[in-house]
C-alpha cells in the first residue's frame, strides 16, 4: 500500500509540473528533463509520462490547439508525433516546412502554448500506416540505394533529411527552452531485423547506430529512445538510447526487458499503448473495448509505468498519404482514409465513451484537469449539386503520353501517386485470358471504351476474359492505393505493373502509351463540359453555398471508388467496399459563401447528380 501511495504522489507530481512553455528560439532553458537513476526527471523531480500520439500531418493546423486541449482535458501531459520525411520533402531537394499542416514549428509552438511536453519521432522510418512508411517514393529509383540498411546512398539521404529537420526543431528542445523532451531513433527496427534475417545482425546494428549518430550530429541533445516489441529488443535496441516497449501488457516483462538493455534500471515506458487499431479497405473496422483498455491502463498506473496512447487522436489520411500492409495470402492491404483508430478522440475531434472512461481514471491522479473543450460545430449539406461532368477518356485527348515497348511502373514514369492509364492499340484481333499478376494495386480494364472488368490485388483478382477485335484499343486505368509501410516488402513497393500483362500466356509488349494522371491538384473542367459515358471514369464538378462553415461528412456510400477535392484539398479515397463510407470534411476547409467540389469517380456504374454532407461518420459498414 505504501508503494502504491508513493506512485500516486509521483503521478500527481508529473501531471502538475507543466505550467506552460514559452518558446523563444535559442532561449535559455526554463525547465530541465533527463533520464537519471531509473526515472524520468523533470525540473529535478521524478515524473511519469502520460502521453498521447497525434500526428500534426493528419490534423488540420486550424484544429491543433483544439486537439491538444482535448488531450490536456483527458489528463495527459505530453504529445508524441511522427515526422514523416515524405511530407516535407515534396520533390527531390524541395522542402516544405511552412505551408498548412507542414508547419512543424507552429505545431511545436501550439504544444508549448498548451503546456504539453513533446516526444518527437522523426524516423527516418516511421511506419504509422503512412505512404511508404514516410520515405520519399523516389528513393526506390536510385539504383545504388538500399533503404533501411547500412548503405551510403541511403544514409546520405537520411543525413540530409535529419539536418533539414533539425534546422526547424533544434531550438524547440527543452534544453533551448522548448517543449521537446525526447527524440526517437529509427522506429520499431527490431521488427525489421526479425523480418530481414538475410542481413547480418551486426550490419543492422551499424545502420541503427548511424541513425542515432546523425541525430546527435544534427544537434539533438535530449534523451533518445527506441520503441519495439519487448521480444525484439535484440535487434531494435540502440546503445545510448532508452528502450521502450510497444504493446506489452505484462509489467514484469517490461521491467525485465528494459533492465536487460538499460543497465539494470528503468525508466519503464510503453511507447505505443494501443487504444484501437489500424483499418484496411475490404476488412472490418477494428475496435478495442474501453473496459479492456482502462483495465490495462490501471495496471500501468499502479506499477509506475509511463505510457503513450497510440493513438489518442488519429485524424485523417488526407490526399494520397495512407499506406498499406500485406500478408502471405493478401498481396496488398491498403489503409482507409480515416485514421480514426477507435481512439479516445475521434477523427473529428469528439470525446468518445473511451475518452470519458480514461478521463475518469486519470482525474483521480490529477485534480487540475481542465474542462473538456466544446466540439467544433457540425453542419449538414443535404444537396451538393454536381453540374458538370467529363469522362476521363475525353480529357486525355489533349495529353501527350509516354510511349514505351513495356509497361513502366509509376516510379519509372517519374510519378509518385495517383493514376496511370496504360493504352495499347491492336491491329490484329485477340481473345482469351488477360493475366496481370504483376499489378501492384487496382485497375479497370476497357476495350474500345467499354468496361470489361477489374484487376484487384486486394481481393486477388489478377485475370479476366477479354476479346479485343481487329483495330481496337485496350485501356487499363491503374491506381496507386498507397505504398507498403511495414515489413520486409517495403523495399519492393513499386506501383503500376511490375511484370507485363499476358493474353493466353503471351506477353503483350510494344507500342504502349502511358497517360500520367497524378491528380496532385483538383482537375478543372471547362465551362460547358458535360461529357458522360456510363462505365468510363468520370470527373464531376459542382459548387455549393455554406452560410456558416462547420465540420461535415460527405456520404459516399452509394458511390463506387475515387477521390474528392473540396476547395482544392484532396480529402482522400473512398471505396464502396468499406468499411469507411464517409469522408471527413473539416469546417476549416470550407468558406462562407461559394465552395467548389470535384469528384473523380473511377467505376462510374451509376450516374450521380449530387452528394450530401451528413453529421455523423460511417466507418464500420463493410460491403463485400
Predicted regions located by residue number:
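Bacterial Sec-dependent N-terminal signal peptides
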Residues: 1-29
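N-terminal carbohydrate-binding accessory modules
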Residues: 23-78, 109
